[in-house]
Amino acid sequence: MKKILFIDRDGTLVEEPFDFQVDSLDKIKLTSGVIPALLQLQKAGFTFIMVSNQNGIGTVAFPEEDFAVCHEFILDLFSSQGILFDEIFICPHTPEDNCICRKPKTGLLEPYLKETAFAKHYSWVIGDRDTDKEFADNLGVNFLPISKTHTWEMVVSAIINDARKASVQRKTKETAIDLSVQLDSDQTSVIDTPIPFFTHMLEQVAKHGGFDLRLQASGDLEVDEHHLIEDTAIALGEAIRTALGDKWGINRYGYTLPMDESLACVAIDISGRSFCDFKGQFTREFVGGMATEMVPHFFQSLSSALGATIHIEVTGTNHHHMIEACFKVLGRALRQACSRTNNYLPSTKGVL
C-alpha cells in the first residue's frame, strides 16, 4: 500500500508571508531545506499529496488569477527539481463559510480516500499549524510540525531514521519475552537472558547487524532451555519483520565470516517466504550452558517469524567459535539485507 505524506503549502513548503496570502511572485520563498528533504522522502517511496487552505480564492481580496500564477510557479519550481505531487487539494473557502473541505475537516479528500488504499501507520501530515495536527488526527495518521525549531531535516530523520523500529512482547506459560529493535540505530544493545552464552550470541547479532536490540527474556529453564531460545528467535524475527515495514529500498539479500579456524556462511533473502537449511556438525552437547541442538533450531524459528529464506553452513573444530561465527555472520547478513540503498522495492512482484 502507498505511504502518503499529506503536506501543507504555506508555512510548510513556502514561507508564510506577513499578510498570510501568497498572491504575488515576490512573496514566494521556499522553506529552508525543503528540496533535499522531499527528494529523500520521495526516494524512500513516499507519495506526496498537497492539502492547503487558501482563504477566499476568487474574491476581490484574492483574485483567482493571482492565486493561479503563484501556485503554478510553486509547482513548476518543485517539478524542476524532480519533486511531483500526485494530487493537490485546495480549499478556497474562508472559516466563515463553514464548509466541509477546510482543514482540519477531511471532506475535500473523501473521494480520494475512498478510492486509495494507503498505509496509515507509515503516512504523515506535515504542516505548520495546530489545524494540521487536527487534520492528521482526523485522517488517523501521524503528524510532524514544520517551524523554526523543527526543521525539514528533523522531519526526514523522524520519518526515515526512526520509522524502522518495533517491539514484541511474547508471554506464554513457558516464557516471557520483551524485545525491541531499532534497525537504524547503533546504540549499545541491552540484552538479558538467563543463559549467558546465548546472551553473548545475541549481542553478536546486534553488534554486527548494526541495530539496537533491547531484550528481557525469562523462561522455564528448570524444564529445558528450548522454549526460551525458540521464543526469543520468534520474537526477534517478528520485530525485524515489523520494523522493515513495506521493505521499500532494502537490499533484500545478504555473508561469509571466518572466526579463527571456523568458517560460517549465510545466504539470506528477506522474501516473505520462510525456509531454513542449516548445515553443520556439533559433537558437544552443550556450549556455555546452551544446547548445541538449539543453534539450528534458533535459525529455523527466526526464519519462520521473519519470513526469510536462510541457508547457513558452518565448519570448524572449536564449537564456541563455530556457534559464535554463526551468530556474527547472521548479524552481518541482516545488516546487508536490511540496509536501504535503493529507491525501489527489490521484487518484480511489487510486494515482499
From Swiss-Prot:
Main location per the UniProt record: cytoplasm
Where does the record place the region Histidinol-phosphatase? 1-163
Q: Which family does it belong to?
A: In the N-terminal section; belongs to the histidinol-phosphatase family.
Reply yes or no: does the keyword Nucleotidyltransferase apply.
no
- The region called Imidazoleglycerol-phosphate dehydratase is annotated at 164-352
What PROSITE patterns is this protein classified in?
IGP_DEHYDRATASE_1, IGP_DEHYDRATASE_2
Q: Which residues bind Mg(2+)?
A: D8, D10, D128
Give me the Gene Ontology terms describing cellular component: cytoplasm
Q: What is this protein called?
A: Histidine biosynthesis bifunctional protein HisB
Q: Could you list this entry's UniProt keywords, alphabetically sorted.
A: Amino-acid biosynthesis, Cytoplasm, Histidine biosynthesis, Hydrolase, Lyase, Magnesium, Metal-binding, Multifunctional enzyme, Zinc
What EC number is given for this enzyme? 3.1.3.15, 4.2.1.19
